Amino acid sequence: MNVLLTGFFGHRNLGDDLLLSQALQRVPKHYQLYIYWPAGGDAEALPFQRIRPFTMVHSWKEALRHRYRLFIYAGGGLFPSRTFGVRSLISGLLQGLTARHKALNGVGIVPKQPRRWFDLFLRTFDYCSVRDEISRKFVSEITPNVVNCGDLYWGAPLKDKALCLKNIGGGKKLVVCLANPFSATEKKDIRIQRRYELLVKQMTTIITETKSLGYLIHYMPFYMGSDEKFICDVQNFLGSHDKILRQGKDYELDTIDQLFASYDAGICMRFHSILLAVKNNVPCLAICYDHKSEQLLQEAGLSEYGIRYGIRTNEFFGEECDMDDTLLRQVLERALGDPHAFQSKALPFAQRKHQAVIDNYEQLFQLL
């Protein structure tokens, strides 16, 4: 029997790669696994094929040639900023014709209006779980039994931070995970360019402060081909050449938790970098540019470690805003000053979310 997964796969986004790595390990081994993979090719898929063999399908026309026991929308923000119209509904209905059961699994959904066609689409699912409270409230208006299990990467095994530190050793280390907020086209607008220059300056200021405290700085890009540009601009402003961590060289998907746990602190901007910090008990300054990051901190009781940066005004990012320098410094000092205060909340929260994802998968696979 066959299972089909779809998501943002093959886009060189570390967060989505982590979700896929977990999904590959969760689907029961005796099922033939198909993955809708419209972007990239065999080279991009090879690391995942090593985790578990699967058949790639590059178009919905190709996917429709098979029949599936279960069709899963597997994690991530699958409907972040598009207009879901009647054509999208028809496409979703046609895809569903190939499967006995359909499921939304740990997805994030940003409310958009009008939502009539999307509401009809939601009614076609046999099981729905989401990763945040906004998504749960949105879906529950149509499907009352929706589950908020949190992001699916919480289901990865929890690591022993003390053991990771012992294994890697060294002095104080801080990991910096920056998200490039603006495209090259956007930065042609002088107002946007000035906002970007301000952000670069703010990042260099706080990184300089951490260096003065004796921290060794490492950078970890999440969205390949984009985040490196932001990191490069920060490094150029600093006049530094600090290490940039590379997947395949410095870590693999199955060792990223051990690597993250080896750091004493972090400056985290990408959602999954904030998740990794909380999951691995790493006190961090969390720069939140969307609701899911803010909700993660709020649910964990760690809101005081976050500061909002509004990239642009829309349903996904909320209201546009820059960061206050004084508040930014205060949050950094809080993250670095008392690790135990962060860790005392992060560890039990990570344990609860881990169990929530495990319970979610048990419910999901009852459909099989």
Where are the predicted features?
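Active-site anion-handling motifs in enzyme catalytic cores
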Residues: 1-368
